[in-house]
Amino acid sequence: MMQRHERPQAASHPRADALRYDDNLTTERPTFVSHLECAATGERYPADELHNLSRAGKPLIVRYDLDGVRTALTKEALTRRAPDLWRYRELLPVRRTGDIVSLGEAVTPLLAMPKLSARRGAAELLVKDEGRLPTGSFKARGLVMAVSMAKALGVSHMAMPTNGNAGAALAAYASRCGIRSTIFCPQDTPEVNVSEIALQGATVYRVNGLIDDCGKIVAEGKAKVGWFDTSTLKEPYWIEGKKTMGLELAEQLGWQVPDVILYPTGGGTGLIGMWKAFAELEAIGFIGGKRPRMVAVQAAGCAPMVRAFEAGVEHALRWEDAHTIAAGIRVPQAVGDFLILRAVRESKGFAIAVEDDAITAALDEAAREEGFLMCPEGAATYAALKQSLADGRIRRDEQAVLFNCATGLKYPLPPVHRTLDRTKPIDFAAL
């Protein structure tokens, strides 16, 4: 039996009057990128040039001089920095502050869910609420880094496929720095997402297909008109933005890691990025060797990673007829499938699929019991936790962290039909 975790002291941050709000965006700090590396072959590529996939057709990973980072960055130094994503500058790829494109990427809260924990008999259930980020989702982490690096490397036109939230983030950050953006989304993408993308300056098209069909259009356009393909894992810097979830989480837990992380998995950059973050934190002496078990959560209507994990293979076949209410994880085939599966297996975690009915029930329960409106993808992680506690894959004495990847306000909400006629007598006892 594991010992219960001692609740960590909250990380101290500077007083509001101790430094300017934009200190992390204007203070030049040393950067330590050494090179890029093919995730499959290990082939090295120069860091300060524009890249998509490696020659092997696989994602490129940013590597750092971690000995240099270890010398330059201390935990104590972090306590004197403003609480935003850019506080970890030594572990990020943007070299010049002038290239940072920011909309205020604040550290997102880690919220206890005591009622849900008690209901499930779980030791400690925490949710990292990524809906507090610009454009209302964790896609802001990846796209702020991708766009900042695109600006640094002279890109003038970016294109991408999206199920909604990533497109909104690209549109916002690209407009912020004057880069043109063209975005393609499936025909059934919610109107609120498409309108948000268009309002923030992108040219957006609905496509009669799924996100990978949209991706094919982006790839064809790259060859024909030369825009930069910003598809998930087809450029190196989304992962670097997403890994800040792991950096933040470890700091919020007093430089510890939880027992289990449940992560809504489509393209998987966040899961891959956090796994990278924990390795880098250990290398610079900020955490020990313990790792959380990484759980890739998918919808039963689109679960290529679950199928590949259970089959014991390294790559996932395309999932045909993909469908789920959690559109953000409706990704039939992921470029980084082998990296997702590698992280899950190395961590001794697992992949799990949940039905749409279970997602809806989890969303309703979190809102009703905790006053916390999750997005469907985030609710999928709570549904997966319930399922895993019931079947024993997660023990009740383990500390579990769920990721709510967007605000629930960006999604269609159920209608409310109750009305009251003010001109008639009101039976207040019946209200």
Segments from the language model and where they lie:
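Cationic, low-complexity basic patches in intrinsically disordered or flexible, solvent-exposed regions
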Residues: R4-R7
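PLP-dependent amino-acid enzyme catalytic core
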Residues: N24-L431
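Short, low-complexity intrinsically disordered segments enriched in A/P/G/S/L with frequent Arg
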Residues: A11, D17-R20, L25
